[in-house]
């Protein structure tokens, strides 16, 4: 079993590394083709879309992941299918409402909040993708829970940016609006492929009695707040920086942020492979198995992350100059963000551990404290020091959140994720 999980982790890492490379290349293409201002407008619109989609999913991500993981581990495919159908129906209405509100008030948001009137049409096009992105995310999470790791990563992290990157290279795209139209098409197309892929790949099984919406919401609402506050560390920083400084600074921050995320793609890859197993082990009351898996995963992540961290930290100017000569000036931002991502990896899969072991209330409370602290710090330091302040604040917030969660995991599960060498 452990050998199988290691194999899945290696496959996940390779695929996530591929998706990181694609994201890096697409970011290079976007910044070079659109320029700093237009790419900044695109990144602001994208950030608002991601946080809107997060809200629309009602915190169902980890609920779906955990329950599908348990169902698939016991070969109860009818229950897994029934659960996916229920959760997808639940997100249709809120995602359409959120998308509709952004479309309706796109000019007011662009002109009055961000002081970027040209952002209006970009937001309008982004709003069309929100319902499809919400449904696509749930499908990819269901694939992950069913141990179809390859499909989950391909459909969530490789196909959409891949389509966008090819279109940017082939088509005469010069504006954020045109880029957004292609992005929305890539999401809709990938959703259709994902839905058909789920039907083909997953056995039908006997449909089990549907879990009530009330039960799912009681479990998911604490995780909704966790998801929103977690996004506040990354997406929230982009939005706040956009309001205070404008599109040019956003473009530099997002570029550095996306590069630094290459370090923690190992964490994402391991979580994709291990999360369903954590849920199954907890359902069997096997805490020693969870501890062993947690320690081995942290060692694996560090082994792969440290070389990436060293390259990005030693050669930041060279890495950032690839996006354009004007981006080399923000190389210090990349270094700051890289240290935060290294802390993220060193503390292990603390959030996933709590979410997969029915500690979502504790997770919500912990993330609320650190999330509010982080957002306040981002506002203060962004206003005082601009781009550099935003990078410092978001990095301190991410490090504080992960170290706090280490304490929470130790208290509730008896596992100290940073003593993995023992």
Positions of predicted regions on the chain:
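Signature of the first transmembrane helix
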Residues: 4-62, 99-103, 221-247, 379, ...
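Helix-loop junctions and terminal segments of transmembrane helices
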Residues: 58-74, 145, 260-285, 291, ...
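Membrane-interface junctions at transmembrane-helix termini in multi-pass inner-membrane proteins
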Residues: 132-155, 338-369, 409
